[in-house]
Amino acid sequence: IVAMIVVTGSGDQPNARGQALTKGIAAFKSENEKSGSPLFHKLAGRYGTSGCSMGGGGTTYASQADKTLLSSVAMMPWGPVRTGVNVPTLVICGASDGTAPCASHGTPAYAGIPDSVPKMRVEISGGHNGQPSAGGRNSAKYGLAFQKVFLDGDERWLPLLKAAESEETNIK
């Protein structure tokens, strides 16, 4: 597992955050092919994104822009609904989120993903916009399980996803 944190300006909109994610992934791909790089031929070629709030909106932008992604986790996504997302996507929203309410952000983001694409929406009771960074175990639990299923192809994690407290999904 290789992780990358992309820091953008606090005022950057989801598009800018998504562009930063796609540029970061492109840098990983380039380093994997560059002799002399510490990553040369060490990456498995499986890439996914995750982000929170405007970064969650950025993940949907990245999923629209980079068709090589294998998974996307949008936590408490804030931003406009994307069309053309063809990457398996988990949308996590918080029932108590006043910044990116489920009804106006998470649910429309989920609905905008075609039914032909594996997708899941989890609503965390009591969850709020800062919940993932404030030790929100459920966001981490569902996000990790989703990435394990779609990045690694490890279906042993499916029961954890299916046990989510409030979910909508087309994943079998």
Predicted region positions:
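Conserved alpha/beta-hydrolase
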Residues: I1-D12
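Active-site loop/turn elements of alpha/beta-hydrolase fold enzymes
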Residues: V7-G9, P77, G126
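Gly/Ser-rich "nucleophile elbow"/oxyanion-hole loop immediately N-terminal to the catalytic nucleophile
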Residues: Q13-G57
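Alpha-helical scaffolding within the catalytic cores
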Residues: S35, M76-P80, A103-Y110
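A conserved short beta-strand
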Residues: K67-G79, R121
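Active-site-adjacent alpha-helix of alpha/beta-hydrolase-fold enzymes
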Residues: V85-D154
